[in-house]
Amino acid sequence: SFKEMKEMINLKIQESAEMYLETILVLSQRNPSVRSIDIASELDYTKPSVSVAMKNLRENGYINMDADGYITLTVKGKEIAETMYERHTFLSDWLIRLGVDQTTAVEDACRMEHVISADSFDAIKRHITGIENS
Protein backbone atom coordinates (compact mmCIF):
# COMPACT_ATOMS: atom_id res chain seq x y z
CA SER A 1 0.00 0.00 0.00
CA PHE A 2 0.98 3.63 -0.39
CA LYS A 3 1.03 4.12 3.39
CA GLU A 4 3.44 1.19 3.85
CA MET A 5 5.63 2.48 1.03
CA LYS A 6 5.70 5.96 2.61
CA GLU A 7 6.64 4.43 5.99
CA MET A 8 9.46 2.45 4.33
CA ILE A 9 10.79 5.59 2.65
CA ASN A 10 10.63 7.52 5.94
CA LEU A 11 12.46 4.68 7.69
CA LYS A 12 15.19 4.73 5.01
CA ILE A 13 15.54 8.51 5.37
CA GLN A 14 15.75 8.19 9.16
CA GLU A 15 18.31 5.37 8.85
CA SER A 16 20.38 7.44 6.43
CA ALA A 17 20.29 10.50 8.75
CA GLU A 18 21.35 8.33 11.71
CA MET A 19 24.20 6.88 9.66
CA TYR A 20 25.46 10.34 8.70
CA LEU A 21 25.24 11.61 12.30
CA GLU A 22 27.10 8.56 13.60
CA THR A 23 29.78 9.01 10.92
CA ILE A 24 30.24 12.69 11.86
CA LEU A 25 30.65 11.64 15.51
CA VAL A 26 33.26 8.97 14.67
CA LEU A 27 35.17 11.31 12.34
CA SER A 28 35.14 14.13 14.90
CA GLN A 29 36.70 11.77 17.46
CA ARG A 30 39.64 11.30 15.06
CA ASN A 31 39.84 14.93 13.95
CA PRO A 32 37.62 17.78 15.23
CA SER A 33 37.52 19.38 11.75
CA VAL A 34 34.92 17.40 9.77
CA ARG A 35 33.86 18.41 6.26
CA SER A 36 31.50 16.90 3.69
CA ILE A 37 34.45 15.48 1.74
CA ASP A 38 35.57 13.52 4.84
CA ILE A 39 32.09 12.02 5.20
CA ALA A 40 31.97 11.19 1.48
CA SER A 41 35.30 9.36 1.58
CA GLU A 42 34.48 7.57 4.88
CA LEU A 43 31.15 6.24 3.57
CA ASP A 44 32.27 5.96 -0.07
CA TYR A 45 29.37 8.21 -1.15
CA THR A 46 29.44 10.95 -3.78
CA LYS A 47 30.09 14.50 -2.65
CA PRO A 48 26.72 15.74 -4.07
CA SER A 49 24.69 13.14 -2.14
CA VAL A 50 26.54 14.02 1.07
CA SER A 51 25.92 17.74 0.42
CA VAL A 52 22.17 17.13 0.06
CA ALA A 53 22.15 15.10 3.28
CA MET A 54 24.11 17.79 5.15
CA LYS A 55 21.64 20.45 3.97
CA ASN A 56 18.74 18.34 5.32
CA LEU A 57 20.51 17.65 8.62
CA ARG A 58 21.32 21.34 9.00
CA GLU A 59 17.75 22.44 8.18
CA ASN A 60 16.41 19.97 10.75
CA GLY A 61 18.76 21.20 13.46
CA TYR A 62 21.04 18.15 13.75
CA ILE A 63 24.26 19.79 12.58
CA ASN A 64 25.87 23.21 12.26
CA MET A 65 28.08 24.14 9.35
CA ASP A 66 30.35 27.17 9.41
CA ALA A 67 31.35 29.40 6.47
CA ASP A 68 34.38 27.17 5.76
CA GLY A 69 32.21 24.04 5.55
CA TYR A 70 33.22 22.58 8.89
CA ILE A 71 30.48 20.43 10.42
CA THR A 72 29.63 20.03 14.09
CA LEU A 73 26.79 18.12 15.72
CA THR A 74 24.12 20.03 17.61
CA VAL A 75 22.99 18.71 21.01
CA LYS A 76 20.13 16.72 19.45
CA GLY A 77 22.37 15.52 16.60
CA LYS A 78 24.99 14.34 19.07
CA GLU A 79 22.36 12.49 21.17
CA ILE A 80 21.24 10.48 18.13
CA ALA A 81 24.83 9.87 16.99
CA GLU A 82 25.89 8.63 20.44
CA THR A 83 22.85 6.34 20.66
CA MET A 84 23.66 4.81 17.26
CA TYR A 85 27.35 4.49 18.11
CA GLU A 86 26.62 2.77 21.42
CA ARG A 87 24.22 0.34 19.72
CA HIS A 88 26.72 -0.31 16.94
CA THR A 89 29.69 -1.04 19.21
CA PHE A 90 27.64 -3.07 21.69
CA LEU A 91 25.89 -5.20 19.03
CA SER A 92 29.03 -5.80 16.94
CA ASP A 93 31.08 -6.75 20.03
CA TRP A 94 28.31 -9.10 21.16
CA LEU A 95 28.04 -10.78 17.74
CA ILE A 96 31.84 -11.23 17.60
CA ARG A 97 31.79 -12.83 21.07
CA LEU A 98 29.07 -15.18 19.79
CA GLY A 99 31.50 -16.33 17.09
CA VAL A 100 30.34 -14.24 14.13
CA ASP A 101 33.28 -13.08 11.99
CA GLN A 102 34.14 -9.40 12.43
CA THR A 103 33.09 -8.20 8.96
CA THR A 104 29.66 -9.84 9.19
CA ALA A 105 29.21 -8.74 12.81
CA VAL A 106 29.93 -5.11 11.95
CA GLU A 107 27.66 -5.17 8.87
CA ASP A 108 24.81 -6.81 10.80
CA ALA A 109 25.21 -4.45 13.76
CA CYS A 110 25.09 -1.55 11.31
CA ARG A 111 21.69 -2.72 10.04
CA MET A 112 20.33 -3.73 13.46
CA GLU A 113 21.24 -0.46 15.19
CA HIS A 114 18.76 1.50 13.05
CA VAL A 115 15.73 -0.78 13.31
CA ILE A 116 15.83 -2.04 16.90
CA SER A 117 13.64 -0.16 19.38
CA ALA A 118 15.16 1.47 22.44
CA ASP A 119 13.19 -0.98 24.64
CA SER A 120 14.52 -4.06 22.85
CA PHE A 121 18.09 -2.78 22.78
CA ASP A 122 17.98 -1.92 26.49
CA ALA A 123 16.55 -5.37 27.30
CA ILE A 124 19.29 -7.15 25.31
CA LYS A 125 21.94 -4.95 26.93
CA ARG A 126 20.59 -5.63 30.45
CA HIS A 127 20.43 -9.37 29.74
CA ILE A 128 23.97 -9.61 28.35
CA THR A 129 25.46 -7.33 30.99
CA GLY A 130 23.65 -9.38 33.65
CA ILE A 131 25.05 -12.66 32.30
CA GLU A 132 28.58 -11.25 32.13
CA ASN A 133 28.40 -9.86 35.68
CA SER A 134 27.08 -13.08 37.27
Residue ranges and their predicted role:
Residues E42, I80, R97:
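Residues within the alpha-helical elements of helix-turn-helix
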Residues S1-E4, E107-S134:
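C-terminal regulatory/oligomerization modules of transcriptional regulators
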Residues Y85-A118:
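Arg/Lys-rich, alpha-helical DNA-contact motif
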Residues S1-S16:
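N-terminal leader segment of winged-helix/HTH proteins
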Residues S36-A67:
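Canonical helix-turn-helix DNA-binding module
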